[in-house]
């Protein structure tokens, strides 16, 4: 005997739990955007101090921001990325976060 459950109705608890699991399964990323204000050396310094990146890695990310207009500088939970974005804003950098799919 095979027992199958009915599909979840839109907005039902089963569907909401599934959407919630999908949202937490995909990591979030912090993106730093190029701006006309901050010097490249300062951006490298901020990456080293805030994230503990080595100078070569921080320089690589800074060059990606400079040349491509943006770079992903960290990934993790939504809450952790909110903290990273706040720290970058406090340092004067343009940063956003988005879910990485």
UniProtKB/Swiss-Prot annotation:
It comes from Mycobacterium marinum (strain ATCC BAA-535 / M). This is ATP-dependent Clp protease adapter protein ClpS. Residues 1-24 are annotated as: Disordered. Gene3D superfamilies: 3.30.1390.10. Belongs to the ClpS family. SUPFAM superfamilies: ClpS-like (SSF54736). The lineage of its organism: Bacteria, Bacillati, Actinomycetota, Actinomycetes, Mycobacteriales. Residues 13-23 have a biased composition (Polar residues). It holds the Pfam family ClpS. Involved in the modulation of the specificity of the ClpAP-mediated ATP-dependent protein degradation. Binds to the N-terminal domain of the chaperone ClpA. GO terms for biological process: protein catabolic process; proteolysis.
